[in-house]
Amino acid sequence: MSVLTPLLLRGLTGSARRLPVLRAQVHSKPPREKLGTMDVAIGLTSCFVCFLLPSGWVLSHLETYKKRE
């Protein structure tokens, strides 16, 4: 590495440090009604059944798919 490398890198990163970081101004209202335990349980169960169960079945039967000709 040359002696000028740190100076060149400092010059490149110095302009990036001065750029402002834009943040999104996202605000929301409080929920109209609070979710109960049963609502959360039904939501998590439906996500499990719809997404994780079929993918788990395919992964467990992967060897049978490979053996077919």
UniProtKB/Swiss-Prot annotation:
Q: Which GO terms describe its cellular component?
A: mitochondrial inner membrane; respiratory chain complex IV
Pathway, per record = Energy metabolism; oxidative phosphorylation
- Hey, which stretches end up on the Mitochondrial intermembrane side? 61-69
Q: Which SUPFAM superfamilies match?
A: Mitochondrial cytochrome c oxidase subunit VIIIb (aka IX) (SSF81431)
Primary location class: mitochondrion
Q: Which domain of life is it from?
A: Eukaryota
What membrane topology does this protein have?
Single-pass membrane protein
- Name the keywords, alphabetized: Membrane, Mitochondrion, Mitochondrion inner membrane, Transit peptide, Transmembrane, Transmembrane helix, Ubl conjugation
Which stretches are transmembrane? 37-60
Modification comment: In response to mitochondrial stress, the precursor protein is ubiquitinated by the SIFI complex in the cytoplasm before mitochondrial import, leading to its degradation. Within the SIFI complex, UBR4 initiates ubiquitin chain that are further elongated or branched by KCMF1.
Mitochondrial matrix topological domain residue ranges? 26-36
Q: Where in this protein would one find the motif SIFI-degron, according to its record?
A: 2-19
Q: Name one Pfam family in it.
A: COX8
Could you tell me which residues form the transit peptide? 1-25
Return the similarity comment: Belongs to the cytochrome c oxidase VIII family.
Quaternary structure, per UniProt, is:
Component of the cytochrome c oxidase (complex IV, CIV), a multisubunit enzyme composed of 14 subunits. The complex is composed of a catalytic core of 3 subunits MT-CO1, MT-CO2 and MT-CO3, encoded in the mitochondrial DNA, and 11 supernumerary subunits COX4I, COX5A, COX5B, COX6A, COX6B, COX6C, COX7A, COX7B, COX7C, COX8 and NDUFA4, which are encoded in the nuclear genome.
Q: What does this protein do?
A: Component of the cytochrome c oxidase, the last enzyme in the mitochondrial electron transport chain which drives oxidative phosphorylation. The respiratory chain contains 3 multisubunit complexes succinate dehydrogenase (complex II, CII), ubiquinol-cytochrome c oxidoreductase (cytochrome b-c1 complex, complex III, CIII) and cytochrome c oxidase (complex IV, CIV), that cooperate to transfer electrons derived from NADH and succinate to molecular oxygen, creating an electrochemical gradient over the inner membrane that drives transmembrane transport and the ATP synthase.
Q: Please report the name of this protein according to its UniProt entry.
A: Cytochrome c oxidase subunit 8A, mitochondrial
Q: Which organism is it from?
A: Eulemur fulvus fulvus
Q: What gene name is given for the protein in this entry? A: COX8A
